[in-house]
């Protein structure tokens, strides 16, 4: 695996947080292509892939979290829809930092 890649459990958050401020001061939009990560700098672009179905999406880090072990990312509801794991709630995802 490349040094800019990671694999781990991802979750999603959405409608209940709509309009609330994210850690970087933006208002959360559940449909936006954004994600929370515990350490990556804000505005970092990350390709998140679901190896179960081959889908991937590029997301922008604008929030902090998740705060539940062993999760490594929390994606927006819209991103989870595109990745195909809304019903499951969790997925073992691959993350690739693009810049």
Language-model segments: residues:
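Secreted/periplasmic proteins
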Residues: 1-99
């Amino acid at each position: 695996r490349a040094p800019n890649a990671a694999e781990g459990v991802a979750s999603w958050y959405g409608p209940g947080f709509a309009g609330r401020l994210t850690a970087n001061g933006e208002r959360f939009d559940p449909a936006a292509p954004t994600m929370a990560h515990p350490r990556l700098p804000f505005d970092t672009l990350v390709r998140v892939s679901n190896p179960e179905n081959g889908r991937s999406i590029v997301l922008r880090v604008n929030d902090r979290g998740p705060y539940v072990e062993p999760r490594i990312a929390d994606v927006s509801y819209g991103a989870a829809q595109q990745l195909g794991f809304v019903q499951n709630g969790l997925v073992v995802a691959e993350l690739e930092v693009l810049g």
